Structure formats: structure tokens, C-alpha cells
Amino acid sequence: MLLHWVLAIALIAIFGLGLYMTGLPFSPQRLKLYNWHKWAGVTILALSVLRLVWRITHRPPALPLAMERAMPVWQKAAHHATHHLLYVLFFAVPLIGWAYSSAAGFPIVFLGVWQLPDFVPVSKELAEAIKPWHELSAYAMAGLVVVHVAAALKHQTIDRDGLLQRMLPGKR
């Protein structure tokens, strides 16, 4: 559960940082924020690996039978689709960002110490082709996070089925 909340906070922070930094004029401050954004992306990628390993080795608790029976089939399908797409995007967004950074010729030097390898060649054309995919996938992930939060709030305020309490720290 800790990984869930750390990733949630990190994703909100990096998305906000991404929106903010791209609106700044070219400056040392903007370059610094781009580095922070890259570092956060690498951290999110590492946390996503841990989260996936945890999810594979630790099944989530089953829904209470009454809740399972009351939930329409479309909601179950939406729940599973949203979670699966979020996992895909946990990896896709930072990897696409890494590819964009590599293609643009701006290496990622994690925490200013460890240079990550470029995994695509430097190419202005490739960078221009990759950049919109990073943005679109980030917006897709933000949209799915909003759907995820809205569904949790729906369960709390409309269904009143206690599902949200199961997601809060210390409530299992």
C-alpha cells in the first residue's frame, strides 16, 4: 500500500512539474526543473518495477462477497482495464521520456551523478516524433488517475461500501 501512495504523490508531482516547466522561458531554472523531472521519472520507473513485482507476488485482497455481487459487470471491467492501463503507463511514460531525452541529445544524469545510457540514437527527427507520445501518454495517465480517484470517491459517497477505507494507509 505504501508504494501505491508514494507513486500517487510522485505522479501528481511530476505531472504538475511537467506542466509548469514546459511553460517557462529557456533559462537555467527551466533546465534545472527538466533535470528534476527526469530524476523523478527514473524514480517512478524504479518504483513501478517494485510495484509490479509486489503485485505479482502479493495478490490484492478479494472484494467482500456482497460488494462483488453488487458491482455491475461494466464496473468490474472498467476497474480491471483502468488498473492494467495504469501499469502499462507507469512504464511507458518514463521510458518514452527517456527515449525522447536520448534522441534530443540530453542525457539523463540521475541525481547529477549517474549517467543513464541512451537507448536510442541522437536524432532531431526522432526526438520530434517521440515528444508528443510522451506528452500524450502522460495526459492519458493523468486522465486514468482522475478516473481512479473518481471511482474511489463514488464508492465512498454514493455506494458507501467501504472500498475507500481499504485503500487508506493503516485501514486493512
Model region roles, listed by residue range:
Residues 1-172:
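Membrane-embedded alpha-helical bundles that constitute the cytochrome b-like, heme-associated redox core
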